[in-house]
């Protein structure tokens, strides 16, 4: 069994878009794709965890019922897609958790940091999640890239703590589900979704999933809601590299993940833990 997390965020949330565009008071568009995503999961007999940016639940409260009543799970992705290393965010994080809990009727037990921004300097979030009764986190990419990642972190699920974010701590209370990685041309790279789903050949991703399953470990996979609904994603002007990372093969993400769901079993984090 493998794990599928959908980072449910809108078109103005991605870090590379915010980096180049001062977008305030934007109208959400990607939320209009929720029916398409739910129907797609139903057709594939697959359950997923929706890591939702909380402000979208305030804009469209019915999202909660749409997700939960179809057997899926809601996880926390901060209220405004804020990186953990933003100045003074530590003081705000607890209040956002409380607000999200109210919006979801205390249903959320899992967290994913925007842009996988968990690091030694932001490990404070683990103790706060524990205090609020959270069960797991999925913010570790066990390879270092220019945008995110923790070099040499454990690649299979482990107990995480604020003093040990990269390997098992038997005293840890939270389960960490690190994202899938693989070896490519002698180098370890991410393979668990997003840009890497769009750019890597499916044969490499299939091989990575098989390797994890061969050691009785789930492959943790993710995709952004805007990658599943590119028809709602506006094309914005950005520098060449950032434009490439955001938009390259955007139209292929849905089909590539669909083929993986037909080959391998995926479920939500909640159902896997149970």
Residue spans of the language-model regions?
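Short, solvent-exposed loop/turn segments at secondary-structure junctions
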Residues: 9-11, 55-57, 80-81, 116-118, ...
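Active-site beta->alpha N-cap acidic-glycine motif
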Residues: 1-70
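Metal-dependent polysaccharide deacetylase catalytic core of the NodB/CE4 family, i.e.
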Residues: 44-122, 134, 139-146, 172
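Conserved, mostly hydrophobic/aromatic
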Residues: 7, 41, 74-77, 111, ...
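Generic structural signal for well-ordered alpha-helices
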Residues: 34-38, 61-65, 93-101, 126, ...
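C-terminal domain-boundary segment and adjacent tail
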Residues: 43-45, 199-274
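The substrate-binding groove and active-site-proximal loops of carbohydrate-active enzymes
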Residues: 21-28, 47, 51-53, 79-88, ...
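Active-site-adjacent pocket scaffolds in enzyme catalytic domains
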Residues: 106, 113-216
